[in-house]
From Swiss-Prot:
Gene Ontology molecular function, alphabetical: calmodulin binding; potassium channel regulator activity; toxin activity
Further remark: Tertiapin-Q is a stable (non-oxidizable) and functionally similar derivative of tertiapin whose Met-13 residue is replaced with a Gln residue.
Tissue specificity as recorded in UniProt: Expressed by the venom gland.
Annotated site residue numbers, Susceptible to oxidation: 13
Subcellular location: Secreted
Site feature (Is responsible of pH dependence of the channel block) residues: 12
Keywords assigned by UniProt, alphabetized: Calcium-activated potassium channel impairing toxin, Calmodulin-binding, Disulfide bond, Ion channel impairing toxin, Neurotoxin, Oxidation, Potassium channel impairing toxin, Presynaptic neurotoxin, Secreted, Toxin
Post-translational note: Oxidation of Met-13 results in the loss of biological activity.
Cystine residue pairs: 3-14, 5-18
Protein name: Tertiapin
Lineage per the UniProt record: Eukaryota, Metazoa, Ecdysozoa, Arthropoda, Hexapoda
Length: 21
């Protein structure tokens, strides 16, 4: 699955890719 960092809710698996903690 692709990580969409533009979404308000981001899966915790995508946080690292999106730079979120």
């Amino acid at each position: 699955a692709l990580c969409n960092c533009n979404r308000i809710i981001i899966p915790h698996m995508c946080w690292k890719k999106c730079g979120k903690k």
